[in-house]
From Swiss-Prot:
Annotated coiled-coil segments of the chain: none
A single Gene Ontology CC term: cytosol
Gene responsible for this protein: leuS
Molecular function (Gene Ontology), one example: ATP binding
Organism: Wolbachia pipientis wMel
Name this polypeptide is given: Leucine--tRNA ligase
InterPro entries: aa-tRNA-synth_I_CS, aa-tRNA-synth_Ia, Leu-tRNA-ligase, Leu_tRNA-synth_edit, M/V/L/I-tRNA-synth_anticd-bd, Methionyl/Leucyl_tRNA_Synth, Rossmann-like_a/b/a_fold, tRNAsynth_Ia_anticodon-bd
C-alpha cells in the first residue's frame, strides 16, 4: 500500500480554514512573511520563506494562540508597465492574472493563511487609505514638495530614492544613474532620524547585521559647521566636517557638482571659466568611489584662522546629499583628500603627530611651516589615527579629542561655526514618473497653488485607457484624466501625474492586515501589532524595513495607532542555491538539461554553487517538486539541514530522502494501527522507561528549538524520534509506541501538515504535547574512574550514590587492571570522579 499524497494534499487544502477569531480572548501571535510581487510564478526562495513562516504559525496555533497569518500582493511596479508595453495588455490585467496563478501555487503548498484577509496594493480599496495618510502627513508637516537634485534612471525613466541606487546604478535596471533637478514630493523621515537610530537597540530579536546596516545608513555624525568667506564674492561657503581639529592642515576646499555656487559660476554671475562645463560633466560621470577628480573653480576661500587662501574645487567625491555639499580638504589626515592632493599637487600638511609621520619637537611646532610639511609627501597614505596636535596654533599640544572641543568653542566665539550633528539619512523622495502606482492626491491650480484632494473625493483612481507606445509617464499624456476642477475655486486645474514610490505601499501593509476591511483600525492594530515574527530576505534591510519603521512613527504621530516598531522578531532567511552548468559553448543550462547531457556523455561545465537565478538557469521549479513528490516533501526539504538564516544548497538526493521519510512515517503508522490515544505509561520500567525518557527529552528539545526558530534542529529531532519508536518491541511496548506516535504526529504537523492531518484521523487531534518534567531529569550519572590520575574507564551509577558504594563499584570496574591488595587509597567525588591510588 502506497501513500497517495496527491489526493490527501488536495483534500486538506480544500478543507482547511484558518480564519481569525473575532473574540480577541486568546493571546495573539502575528506571523507574516514579506508579501510577494505578483510576477506570475513562485520560486524556491518563496517556498522557503513561506514554509518558515507557516511552521511558526502552525506551532503557535497548536499552543493556543490566536494567530494572524495573512497574505497579500505587492502589486504595483514597473514590470507590469513593461509587460503592458511588450504584450499589448493592461498592467491591471497582467497583474491580476499573475495573482490568480500565484494564489493557486501558494495554496498547493498547504500554507495556513488567513485567506479572508488577502489584499492587493493595486486595488483602490487599499490605496485610498494611503492617499489619506499622505494628506494627514501634509497636515502634520511630514510631507512637502521641493525642487531638488534627484537620482534619475535613464532606462526606467523615473526617479530613484538614495536607497535604490546601488554602486551608482539603478537597483532594478542596472543603468548608471544621472542627476536631475525636479520638483518632487518628500516624506520627512529625517524628523525621526535620532529615534530610528536609538530604538535599534530595543530590537533584541533582530539580526545584528541588519541593525548595523540601518545604523550606517542613518549615519549619525557629530562634528561642526564652519563658514568660509569666498574671496571676491559676497558669499559664505558652509562646510560640515567631523574633523574640525584638522583645519590648520587644510590646503583646499571642494564642493559637489550640484552645489549652488557652481550654478552661480555657470550662470556667469561671478567668474567665467571656459572649461567649467566640461569639467563638471566629467565629475558627474565619475562615482564617489572612482578615481578622485576635480576642476578648479577660479575661486578661493579665506582660511578662518590663518592669513592664507584655499583654492576652491568641484570634486566627484563630495556629495550634495551629505552635510552641506562642501568640504575642506586636509590631505595629511583623510585618504580621499590625500589622493586628490597628490593628483593636483596640493600641499599635504600634517597637524597630528604620530610614529607614522614622526613627532615634531615641541620647541619647533610653531615654526613648522607648509613648505616643510610638503616633505611628508613621501608618505603613501593619510594618517587617520589619534595623536597630539602641532602646527595648529592654539591647539598645539592637545590630544585629538581635546582639540575637537577647543576649536568648536573657538568657532562659536568668532561666530563662524558651531557644533553640529549630521545624518547621512535624507528625506524620502516618493514621487515616481510611472503609471502603475498609487496616484498622489494633489491638484495644481494656477490661482490657488497646490491643493490637496478633498478626503470625500478619495480614492483618486488610475485611468484604464492609457497608452504605452512611448517612454515616460502615460498619465502626463492622458487627454482627460489629469484635467480637473480646483476644489477651492472651481477653475480648471491639473492633477499631479506622478505616482508614489511602490515602497509606500509596502511600508504599511502589515497594519492593513489587522482589520477585515484593510483600513487602519486603531483597536485592531493595537490588538495585533507589532508583528511577532517577520520573515524575509536581508536585501530589504535598509529600504523596506527602514521605511516601515518610519511609517509606524508617522502614523502614530497622526493618531492612527500607538506603535513605534512594526516587527518584534525579524528572521532573514538565507537564499536557496544550486550548482551552475554550461555546455561546451558556454551557454547556461538548466539542471535537468545538464543531467541529460551528462547521461549522454556530453561535456558539461559544472560551475560554483550560487543563488538560484533565471539568468544562470540554476533553478528548480517548486511546482515540479510538488507534483512529483508532494507539498509535504517540498516543505520538509527546504526546512531540513540548514538553519533558516543560512543559505541552503539544493540537493536532488536530499529531496529523495525527505520523500522516503514521509512514506516511511506513513507506513509505520499504518502498520501500528489502531493507535490508542488513552495510553498509560506512568509505570514502565527498564528498557521501556529509557525509551520513554528519550522520547520526552526529544520533545522537550524540539519544543525549545521551535521557540527559538532552530527549525533544522527540530527536523533532526523528530526524525530521531521516528527511529526510536520503530525500535520499540510492539509486543511488550505497544502502549509506549502509541504515546510516541501521538507525540510524533503532533510535532511534525507544522512541517508536513497534510500527512500529519491525515494520520490524525487515525489517532484523533490533540494540542501541542508537553514533555513530562520528571523524565527529563537523569537518575544516573557517568563517573570517570582514574588510576593514579589517569583515566581508565567510566561507570554509570545512581545519582548521589553513597561514597563507599561508589568506591567499591569503581574498584570492581578496573579489577582486571589492578592488584586490589596494592590499593593505597581511593578518592571519590560523588557524581563526578573516582581516583584510585596504588
Amino acid at each position: 500500500m502506497k501513500y497517495d499524497f496527491k489526493s490527501v494534499e488536495k483534500f486538506y487544502q480544500d478543507k482547511w480554514d484558518f480564519s481569525v477569531s473575532k473574540s480577541g480572548k486568546q493571546e495573539k501571535c502575528y506571523v507574516l512573511e514579506m508579501f510577494p510581487y505578483p510576477s506570475g510564478k513562485i520560486h524556491m526562495g518563496h517556498l522557503r520563506n513561506y514554509a518558515i513562516g507557516d511552521v511558526i504559525a502552525r506551532y503557535k496555533r497548536a499552543n493556543g494562540f490566536e494567530v494572524l497569518h495573512p497574505i497579500g500582493w505587492d502589486a504595483f511596479g514597473l514590470p507590469a508597465e513593461n509587460a503592458a508595453r511588450d504584450n499589448n495588455i493592461s498592467p491591471e490585467t497582467w497583474t491580476k492574472e499573475n495573482i490568480d496563478n500565484m494564489r493557486t501555487q501558494l495554496k498547493s503548498i498547504g500554507l495556513s493563511y488567513n485567506w479572508e484577509r488577502e489584499l492587493s496594493t493595486c486595488e483602490p480599496d487599499y490605496y485610498k487609505h494611503e492617499q489619506k495618510f499622505f494628506l494627514d502627513f501634509l497636515k502634520h508637516g511630514l510631507a512637502y514638495r521641493k525642487e531638488s537634485w534627484v537620482n534619475w534612471d535613464p532606462v526606467d525613466q523615473t526617479v530613484l530614492a538614495n536607497e535604490q541606487v546601488v554602486d551608482g546604478k539603478g537597483w532594478r535596471s542596472g543603468a548608471v544613474v544621472e542627476k536631475r533637478k525636479l520638483s518632487q514630493w518628500f516624506l520627512k523621515i529625517t524628523d525621526f532620524a535620532e529615534d530610528l537610530l536609538k530604538c535599534l537597540q530595543s530590537l533584541k530579536n533582530w539580526p545584528e547585521k541588519v541593525k548595523t546596516m540601518q545604523e550606517r545608513w542613518i549615519g549619525k555624525s557629530e562634528g561642526a559647521t564652519i563658514e568660509f568667506e569666498v574671496v571676491g564674492l559676497n558669499k559664505k561657503l558652509k562646510v560640515f566636517t567631523t574633523y574640525p581639529h584638522t583645519l590648520f592642515g587644510a590646503s583646499f576646499c571642494a564642493v559637489a557638482a550640484e552645489h549652488p555656487i557652481v550654478q552661480d559660476l555657470k550662470n556667469g554671475s561671478s567668474v567665467v571659466i571656459p572649461v567649467l562645463d566640461t569639467g563638471i560633466q566629467e565629475i558627474k560621470s565619475k562615482r564617489e568611489n572612482d578615481e578622485k577628480i576635480g576642476v578648479y573653480t577660479g575661486l578661493n576661500v579665506k582660511h578662518p584662522f590663518l592669513d592664507k587662501e584655499l583654492p576652491l574645487y568641484i570634486a566627484n567625491f563630495v556629495l550634495m546629499e551629505y552635510g552641506e555639499g562642501a568640504i575642506f580638504g586636509c590631505p595629511a589626515h583623510d585618504q580621499r583628500d590625500f589622493e586628490f592632493a597628490q593628483k593636483y599637487n596640493l600641499p599635504i600638511i600634517p597637524v597630528i603627530s604620530s610614529a607614522h609621520l614622526g613627532v615634531i619637537p615641541a620647541r619647533d611646532q610653531n615654526s613648522y611651516n607648509g613648505s616643510q610639511c610638503q616633505a611628508t609627501q613621501m608618505t603613501k597614505e593619510a594618517y587617520t589615527g589619534d595623536g597630539t596636535m602641532f602646527n595648529s596654533e592654539f591647539l598645539n599640544g592637545l590630544m585629538v579629542s581635546e582639540a575637537k572641543e577647543a576649536i568648536v568653542k573657538k568657532f562659536e566665539e568668532k561666530k563662524i561655526g558651531k557644533k553640529t550633528i549630521n545624518y547621512r539619512l535624507h528625506d524620502w523622495g516618493v514621487s515616481r514618473q510611472r503609471y502603475w502606482g498609487c496616484p498622489i492626491p494633489i491638484i495644481y491650480c494656477k490661482d490657488c497653488g497646490t491643493v490637496p484632494v478633498p478626503e470625500k473625493d478619495l480614492p483618486v483612481v488610475l485611468p484604464i485607457d492609457v497608452e504605452f507606445t512611448s517612454g515616460g509617464n502615460p498619465l502626463d499624456k492622458h487627454p482627460t484624466w489629469k484635467f480637473v476642477d480646483c476644489p477651492k475655486c472651481g477653475k480648471q486645474a491639473e492633477r499631479e501625474t506622478d505616482t508614489f514610490d511602490t515602497f509606500f505601499e509596502s511600508s504599511w501593509y502589515f497594519a492593513a492586515f489587522c482589520s477585515e476591511d484593510k483600513s487602519i483600525d486603531k483597536d485592531a492594530c493595537n490588538r495585533f501589532m507589532p508583528v511577532d515574527y517577520y520573515i524575509g530576505g536581508i536585501e530589504h534591510a535598509i529600504l523596506h524595513l527602514l521605511y516601515s519603521r518610519f511609517f509606524c512613527r508617522a502614523l502614530t504621530k497622526c493618531g492612527y495607532f500607538d506603535i513605534k516598531e512594526p516587527f518584534s522578531t525579524l528572521i532573514t532567511q538565507g537564499m536557496v542555491c544550486h550548482a551552475t552548468y554550461k555546455d561546451e559553448n558556454g551557454k547556461w543550462l538548466f539542471p535537468a538539461e545538464a543531467k541529460e547531457l551528462i547521461a549522454r556523455g556530453a561535456k558539461v561545465q559544472v560551475g560554483k554553487v550560487e543563488k538560484m537565478s533565471k539568468s544562470k538557469k540554476n533553478t528548480v521549479d517548486p511546482n515540479f517538486i510538488i507534483e512529483k513528490y508532494g507539498a509535504d516533501t517540498a516543505r520538509l526539504f527546504v526546512l531540513s539541514d540548514t538553519p533558516p538564516e543560512k543559505d541552503m544548497e539544493w540537493s536532488d538526493d536530499g529531496v529523495e530522502g525527505c520523500s522516503r521519510y514521509v512514506n516511511k512515517l506513513w507506513r509505520m503508522v499504518m502498520q501500528l494501527r489502531p493507535v490508542n490515544i488513552h495510553y498509560d505509561n506512568e509505570n514502565v520500567t527498564g528498557g521501556l522507561l529509557e525509551y520513554r525518557k528519550k522520547i520526552h527529552k526529544l520533545l522537550h528539545g524540539l519544543t525549545d528549538d521551535l521557540e527559538n526558530c532552530r527549525l533544522n534542529c527540530v527536523v533532526a529531532k523528530f526524525r530521531e524520534m521516528t527511529n526510536l519508536i520503530a525500535e520499540i518491541d510492539v509486543k511488550t511496548g505497544k502502549s509506549l509506541i502509541d504515546e510516541g506516535i501521538c507525540i510524533l504526529i503532533r510535532v511534525i504537523e507544522p512541517f508536513i501538515p497534510h500527512l500529519a492531518e491525515s494520520l490524525w484521523q487515525e489517532i484523533g487531534g490533540q494540542p501541542w504535547p508537553k514533555a513530562d518534567e520528571s523524565l527529563l531529569v537523569d537518575d544516573t550519572v557517568t563517573i570517570a574512574v582514574q588510576i593514579n590520575g589517569k583515566l581508565r574507564t567510566t561507570i554509570k551509577v545512581a545519582i548521589n550514590l553513597p561514597q563507599e558504594e561508589l568506591k567499591k563499584i569503581a574498584i570492581d570496574s578496573v579489577s582486571s587492571k589492578i592488584d586490589q591488595s596494592k590499593v593505597r587509597t581511593v578518592y571519590a567525588v560523588p557524581n563526578k570522579i573516582v581516583n584510585i591510588v596504588i
